[in-house]
């Protein structure tokens, strides 16, 4: 094959005609110093707060400090290959993450990159992670229930859609277990769940993912993971990334639930970054704006007005206390931001009362409006009864003679404590809870031995599912107990008791 000279000249002419000169302009700077995942950069005069800068090797950095002659940047990756004098490029992009249905069922990092080996996240839309919380007019008061599937929570500290309920307690008291149960309880409820793991061990996150997958909950759940080995900047930003992804559903008229596990570790990573950026330390060496760190995050959980689609975002932040010290800086901050707290106690946990909820210290400030009437009817006095039982139990230790009424209160209290115990990963729907609590509070279990209460409850639930499913359905539909239904319930429980052997 021979190429003729005129053909060559033709090709050259075509190339000249289609030639486009491209000049890319980007503002660059120079690394002044780098270390501990913090870089000082000179020369990027127009950089914005929360903007991403590109370092050599594709490592991204987040602009946090804007000073007169340089900017303080938190690196979102390894700093080992970055050195003084390296060029830094502005991207002009504010920190944003992919949102939408594409992230559902995935395990991703705070930047939106998949870490579950299931291929790339094909999201059609991205959103900035720092978004202003909805105002007062945009909101509606909390009025729909968000069931956790736990009798102790749904009966005494009910949670509503759009609420922020703090889960607080020492390490190893079952805080994560309560939240995982809450995710499992959303099956078939049309709620999109988000679990943000901040500073956890990788093995713990893998275990959570496996548990959710095993119970079929990953279909509607997203896990955002910034483990203990990640840079502090990613641990700090992970909560906002998760919140932005959950807000997408809230803004589209759906219901979402987000769990921050846990905000103590987020505050620690923020303190680390602030001190390295030379911001002045305050109480417990936390920076002055650590309250704002959590308030701007948790204020984004809301029940939106009908005009905005009536979507909701419910937040369950977790705080780990040290030796039960609820009056430390971060716990008091988050308690004052949230709409109530569920307090878990190691003593109760070790005594076999699980979930280890201290009923006296746990409150729900707005959830009462969201509780269904049937639950109010059966559990209305439960909190007070348990408080009286605990007081009487303390006196009864002295072995003084007790009158009949006191003995009845003590024996019923013991049975109610036993009844409120629940195995892990076994959430109950509202009708099942109403039946169990009805049997307990109306005295049907007073003659059942304490050690047989759990067996009685299991048998009762099985009996209702097999023989009296019409009553279960009626409770689900009516969401209230009328006289006819109360009579039916009583008769059915009596019938079951005749055949029950402890």
Swiss-Prot record:
Residues annotated as site: Required for activity: 362
Q: What is its EC number?
A: 7.1.2.2
Can you name one GO molecular function term for this protein?
ADP binding
List positions binding ATP. 169-176
Q: Which InterPro entries match?
A: ATP_synth_asu-like_sf, ATP_synth_asu_C, ATP_synth_asu_C_sf, ATP_synth_F1_a_nt-bd_dom, ATP_synth_F1_asu, ATPase_a/bsu_AS, ATPase_F1/V1/A1_a/bsu_N, ATPase_F1/V1/A1_a/bsu_N_sf
Q: Which UniProt keywords apply?
A: ATP synthesis, ATP-binding, Cell inner membrane, Cell membrane, CF(1), Hydrogen ion transport, Ion transport, Membrane, Nucleotide-binding, Translocase, Transport
Known catalytic reactions: ATP + H2O + 4 H(+)(in) = ADP + phosphate + 5 H(+)(out)
Cell location: Cell inner membrane
Q: How does this protein sit in the membrane?
A: Peripheral membrane protein
On the tree of life, the source organism's domain of life is Bacteria
A UniProt-annotated Pfam family: ATP-synt_ab_N
Q: Which GO terms describe its cellular component?
A: plasma membrane; proton-transporting ATP synthase complex
Q: Which PROSITE patterns match?
A: ATPASE_ALPHA_BETA
Summarize the subunit comment: F-type ATPases have 2 components, CF(1) - the catalytic core - and CF(0) - the membrane proton channel. CF(1) has five subunits: alpha(3), beta(3), gamma(1), delta(1), epsilon(1). CF(0) has three main subunits: a(1), b(2) and c(9-12). The alpha and beta chains form an alternating ring which encloses part of the gamma chain. CF(1) is attached to CF(0) by a central stalk formed by the gamma and epsilon chains, while a peripheral stalk is formed by the delta and b chains.
- Family per similarity comment: Belongs to the ATPase alpha/beta chains family.
**Described purpose of this protein according to its UniProt entry:** Produces ATP from ADP in the presence of a proton gradient across the membrane. The alpha chain is a regulatory subunit.
Q: What protein name does the entry list?
A: ATP synthase subunit alpha
What organism is this sequence from?
Solidesulfovibrio magneticus (strain ATCC 700980 / DSM 13731 / RS-1)
């Amino acid at each position: 094959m021979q190429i003729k000279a005129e053909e060559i000249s033709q090709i050259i002419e075509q190339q000249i005609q289609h030639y486009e000169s491209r000049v890319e302009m980007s503002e660059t700077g120079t690394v002044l110093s780098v270390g501990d995942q913090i870089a000082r950069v000179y020369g990027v005069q127009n950089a914005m707060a929360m903007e991403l800068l590109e370092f050599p090797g594709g490592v991204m950095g987040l602009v946090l400090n804007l000073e007169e002659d340089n900017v303080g940047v938190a690196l979102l990756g390894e700093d080992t290959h970055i050195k003084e004098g390296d060029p830094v490029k502005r991207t002009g992009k504010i920190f944003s993450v992919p949102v939408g249905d594409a992230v559902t069922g995935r395990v991703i990092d705070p930047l939106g990159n998949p870490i579950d080996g299931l291929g790339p996240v094909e999201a059609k839309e991205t959103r900035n992670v720092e978004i202003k919380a909805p105002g007062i007019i945009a909101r509606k008061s909390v009025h729909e229930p968000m069931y956790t599937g736990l009798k102790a929570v749904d009966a005494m500290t009910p949670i509503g859609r759009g609420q922020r309920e703090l889960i607080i307690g020492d390490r190893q008291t079952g805080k994560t277990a309560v939240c995982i149960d809450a995710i499992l309880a959303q099956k078939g409820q049309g709620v999109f769940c988000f679990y943000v793991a901040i500073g956890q061990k990788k093995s713990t996150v893998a275990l959570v993912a496996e548990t959710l997958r095993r119970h079929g909950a990953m279909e509607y759940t997203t896990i955002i993971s910034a483990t203990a080995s990640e840079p502090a900047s990613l641990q700090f930003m992970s909560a906002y990334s998760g919140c932005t992804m959950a807000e997408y559903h809230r803004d589209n008229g759906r219901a979402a639930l987000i769990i921050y596990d846990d905000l103590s570790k987020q505050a620690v990573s923020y303190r680390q970054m602030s001190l390295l950026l030379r911001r002045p330390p305050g109480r417990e060496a936390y920076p002055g704006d650590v309250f704002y760190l959590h308030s701007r995050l948790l204020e984004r959980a809301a029940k939106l007005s009908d005009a905005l689609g009536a979507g909701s975002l419910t937040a369950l932040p977790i705080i780990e206390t040290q030796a039960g010290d609820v009056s430390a800086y971060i716990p008091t901050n988050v308690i004052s931001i949230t709409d109530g707290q569920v307090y878990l106690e190691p003593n109760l946990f070790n005594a076999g009362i699980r979930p280890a909820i201290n009923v006296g210290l746990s409150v729900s400030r707005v959830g009462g409006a969201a509780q269904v009437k049937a639950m109010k009817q059966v559990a209305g006095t439960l909190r007070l009864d348990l408080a009286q039982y605990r007081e009487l139990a303390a006196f009864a230790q002295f072995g003084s003679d007790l009158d009949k009424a006191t003995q009845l209160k003590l024996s019923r209290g013991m049975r109610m404590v036993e009844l409120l115990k629940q195995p892990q990963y076994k959430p109950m729907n509202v009708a099942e809870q109403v039946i169990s609590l009805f049997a307990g509070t109306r005295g049907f279990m007073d003659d059942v031995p304490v050690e047989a209460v759990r067996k009685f409850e299991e048998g009762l639930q099985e009996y209702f599912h097999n023989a009296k499913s019409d009553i279960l359905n009626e409770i689900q539909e009516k969401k209230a107990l009328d006289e006819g239904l109360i009579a039916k319930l009583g008769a059915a429980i009596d019938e079951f008791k005749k055949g029950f052997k402890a």
